[in-house]
Amino acid sequence: MRSSASRLSSFSSRDSLWNRMPDQISVSEFIAETTEDYNSPTTSSFTTRLHNCRNTVTLLEEALDQDRTALQKVKKSVKAIYNSGQDHVQNEENYAQVLDKFGSNFLSRDNPDLGTAFVKFSTLTKELSTLLKNLLQGLSHNVIFTLDSLLKGDLKGVKGDLKKPFDKAWKDYETKFTKIEKEKREHAKQHGMIRTEITGAEIAEEMEKERRLFQLQMCEYLIKVNEIKTKKGVDLLQNLIKYYHAQCNFFQDGLKTADKLKQYIEKLAADLYNIKQTQDEEKKQLTALRDLIKSSLQLDQKESRRDSQSRQGGYSMHQLQGNKEYGSEKKGYLLKKSDGIRKVWQRRKCSVKNGILTISHATSNRQPAKLNLLTCQVKPNAEDKKSFDLISHNRTYHFQAEDEQDYVAWISVLTNSKEEALTMAFRGEQSAGESSLEELTKAIIEDVQRLPGNDVCCDCGSAEPTWLSTNLGILTCIECSGIHREMGVHISRIQSLELDKLGTSELLLAKNVGNNSFNDIMEANLPSPSPKPTPSSDMTVRKEYITAKYVDHRFSRKTCSSSSAKLNELLEAIKSRDLLALIQVYAEGVELMEPLLEPGQELGETALHLAVRTADQTSLHLVDFLVQNCGNLDKQTALGNTALHYCSMYSKPECLKLLLRSKPTVDVVNQAGETALDIAKRLKATQCEDLLSQAKSGKFNPHVHVEYEWNLRQEEMDESDDDLDDKPSPIKKERSPRPQSFCHSSSISPQDKLSLPGFSTPRDKQRLSYGAFTNQIFVSTSTDSPTSPIAEAPPLPPRNATKGPPGPPSTLPLSTQTSSGSSTLSKKRSPPPPPGHKRTLSDPPSPLPHGPPNKGAVPWGNDVGPSSSSKTTNKFEGLSQQSSTGSAKTALGPRVLPKLPQKVALRKTETSHHLSLDKANVPPEIFQKSSQLTELPQKPPPGDLPPKPTELAPKPPIGDLPPKPGELPPKPQLGDLPPKPQLADLPPKPQVKDLPPKPQLGELLAKPQTGDASPKAQPPLELTPKSHPADLSPNVPKQASEDTNDLTPTLPETPVPLPRKINTGKSKVRRVKTIYDCQADNDDELTFMEGEVIVVTGEEDQEWWIGHIEGQPERKGVFPVSFVHILSD
């Protein structure tokens, strides 16, 4: 007991708290005091040491709590050592395994010395790894287990749990002592005495029970403390001694293991020195040979020139340089500081691509802002490491990234994208070629993704797979693609459709196979229940299935019973150019490079030789499949010719590209002693010679483009009439002078536009003129019955009611017909954009005026004469609007635009690209021919009237059409006309002031839908000098001209804005009523709903007016004229 007291005393003396509390009791003193009290309670002084006992327990509790915290940290560290050691052991085992495999490769390549060395090092690593595993096991048993037992046993809990029974005994003692003391004092007071204190001897007998309980709990507490001290001290150190011995054994055994290789290592070092000398000598000779060849071919000058160009391409001019690892494209979110008074940070979706930064708005209906990085400068913020500024030509954008790493990524991507765009600009014409290749590759990928089954993973069915197996032509998800990579490139070669820059050669199989077709073969015999994984399956299930499917071909359809039958099927697949049949025999395990027994061919010719010999631009996918899956590209025929020799012999450069992509041996010679390059030079196959030279010098680019009949779909062009009818919202006219091309539509992909022969640049588009239209770019005839009006266009101004005849039977009226010739009512729609409209990304697809398919002859060229003009109607579909004006006005309902299927119009452009689109090149006779049109009869028999409640007036000649502003020079026959065009058959040249006042619209809005003729038939108005010039508005001639379009189908059917008129005289308040909903795209535009009234305050141009909502002057801005109609004053 004395030794226990001394241990406790030494343990406690190191604690500062103990040193600050001198009134404590040691274990030996407690034992002596308690024994004395037990033998003689009345003479004992134990009661005076009660407070010392309590102080001692408090001090011990503090020390135990500190030890508990320290031991928990020790345990955490030891566990970290154990876990990292286990990882280290696993990594060492993996290292030994791959090193052994690597050494085996050397052994198989007749290089035994190096192979044996690698295998021995692999064995050494395995043995050391085993020793380390034993050491970690000792650490777990001796240290971790001991600490776990102590912390989860005696030291379990929190501070104070251990001394709770002691505290209760102390409290009971205090309570009883206070009670007795009070009674003694009361008793003395009753006898007239005053008690100052009560000694322990007086109450020893009365307090004996409580004192014994206190002494018992004190003993229990000290016993537990003693046990804990033993476990955390002696026991733990004994286990650390055991771990020490384990460490000694580990190092001694490891040294013995390493000593076994000592002599071999010394011998190996000498051998390696000799091998290195041999290799250095070879390298020296090769270098000398290379320098000799380079000097003879004068390649030094070319390389220096190329280097200078590349240095120029990396133009910096003190610009910020980004980390190239981040690339030049990125999507994500940035915080952008607003420009308002509050300057708040707003989270915005941003993307960088092709030198353009796109910043989305908070609302999806607003078009994102696009900044050309070539005109911007990226400037990091010195004060905030996560912020940077983007300085454009007209404002500064303040951005903040989520963290510093994201900040570095955005800065690098912005800088790299700008540098890439600058490099592309410096490269000039070369960039256009690369851009067209990128467009083609993008179009092929889009076509691949549309193939049946390619919307889900080929193996597990996950949606939207983006990983391509280039040698199988299938799409997989990212999880399954990882297993494909593990199987090796001889089974499946995985590339990303989004992350990798693919060449068209890598898309040949993907374009021709597809997941459904592939699985019809490879999964034809799936058992039930199906082992095929699902998108939620784990990697083990996926790996088992994919290995069985692609390595073992376990689920494929079996059609051949013998090897000869398989070879026959292989031959037939090549001869019939059936890729799926080729995949079928591949799935059955045919040896693709076995010689084929085909009479009339070179002896020993394989399927690859035959495919190369018979290849053209439609069968490259067969060659590609054989090249990527045969395994031996150097197989020779009886005459020693490889597939490379065949490419040179038969001049097959596209096949050669596919072969060189898989890196065959290019210097194989045939029986004549010629390589493929020699044959190409002898036969002067220049392309093959260049490709083989590049491969021989190591400069061949595997991501190569091949010439192939891709047969890309152009579904975007086949837009039906019904599709267009479902788009009731009109198209706003963009305020820009750039005209719209007849073949441009937002639904046409860039590659489709490039493939159109009639595709022209924006500069060419601006040269479109009316003279080009007379060349009959788009012509359609119809003999269908007359049609009834359909409210598609915005309502037009009323005309005086006179009944007019329908058009000639051979013409197609300017109204929408169904395919059967019957008419239906449709939603009203605004006209297509005017010539000044600039297409933006926010615009919906152009509603090209559609009509029924051609049913008659389609004349082409310039052979327009009076006879054909009177009976065959020229229609110019998909072109910008034109106006035909006249002073004779007849009351018409809403003008109905004819509809021609977009695919018809666009296909006709293929034969119209040779026609002149320049007004200057069109002779005046064209206009004169077009103007010789027969006059329509004024009154038909009642039975011939169509249900259309429209009235016709004499047709104006085409020569009187107004010129398109800024495009057409004045013609000789139009030069002496006033700014406002007039009809040729009216009295000579009435002036602008002679026009009647603005027509009233409201009274005729509903008439076209009723099918009734106007109740008041009036003759056409004559021009009178009664109207004041101030009554005119730019809308009047435009709408009047739109009315006349229904009269003459030979006229271009879409109106052109007239030259801007300057209003003179007193200003008058104009009010218009909206007939469509309009959502503003720009800050200065006006948003309104159908039926609201706008007060016009000004004009920005002919197609855009300025105004505010009536009664709400704060809602103001510009609005398109085609979205409103004018109210009467």
Curated annotation (Swiss-Prot):
Regulation: Activity stimulated by phosphatidylinositol 4,5-bisphosphate (PIP2).
Residue span(s) of domain SH3: 1067-1129
Compositionally biased tracts (Polar residues): 310-321, 738-752, 865-888
Keyword Hydrolase among record annotations: no
Compositional bias of kind Pro residues: 938-972
Region ranges (Disordered): 300-321, 714-763, 780-1063
Comment, domains: The PH domain most probably contributes to the phosphoinositide-dependent regulation of ADP ribosylation factors.
Name of the featured protein: Arf-GAP with SH3 domain, ANK repeat and PH domain-containing protein 1
